[in-house]
Amino acid sequence: MHLDHHHESAAAVSADARRPDGSRRALRIGLGGPVGSGKTATVAALCRALRAELSLAVVTNDIYTREDAEFLLREAVLPPERITAVETGACPHTAIRDDISANLEAVEDLEDEVGPLDLVLVESGGDNLTATFSRGLVDAQVFVIDVAGGDDIPRKGGPGVATADLLIVNKTDLAPYVGSDLARMAADAKAARGELPVVLQSLRGEDGVREVADWVRERIAAWTA
């Protein structure tokens, strides 16, 4: 389920789009959102959906552990050399917005060690509704919320909800059990975001990530055009 409106602008260039050897670097997409909203599950589903057609890698962020990276490794969504972790040691937004050096180094190391990449997914540690990525780190941002957090979250807004290039309302299958009104969430998201796209998804089905994967494909096409 999704709102049928799209934002067609090409992916913004966050930094030099060329590597030192002159080749085009990978498109970088950041995924942020509150703790437990389903960021890692979405990353895993995207890897499964795209790994046959794109050369991709993942950088995860946790404060003191490698928990999210270890989950992806256990799920075998990508070969181990394509998954790396940053231990931020501080609030998650610091490493994706204020001091992006560790994440930039992780991304560049992946490109050096794995070879040419089409896409790098950078997953933030769980944060609040104000979390945003530096455009020096990523070219596009996805923000993930879930219905269990309350159907008033889109109305409350915040930079993540209002300005991310894509908003995902996740775990729609739980709506009947937690009393969330999906139509209200969709309408509030549209009011907060205007023409920016929104996807309502449940990853319980095999094609649950299809719309988000299609959005990523559009960004890749714009990046390589």
From Swiss-Prot:
Gene Ontology annotations for the cellular component aspect, listed alphabetically: cytoplasm
Gene Ontology terms describing biological process: urea catabolic process
InterPro entries with a match to the protein in the record: CobW/HypB/UreG_nucleotide-bd, P-loop_NTPase, UreG
Keyword Chaperone among UniProt keywords: yes
Localization terms from the record: Cytoplasm
Family: Belongs to the SIMIBI class G3E GTPase family. UreG subfamily.
Subunit composition and interactions: Homodimer. UreD, UreF and UreG form a complex that acts as a GTP-hydrolysis-dependent molecular chaperone, activating the urease apoprotein by helping to assemble the nickel containing metallocenter of UreC. The UreE protein probably delivers the nickel.
Protein name, UniProt field: Urease accessory protein UreG
Organism: Streptomyces coelicolor (strain ATCC BAA-471 / A3(2) / M145)
Higher taxonomy: Bacteria, Bacillati, Actinomycetota, Actinomycetes, Kitasatosporales
Gene this protein is translated from: ureG
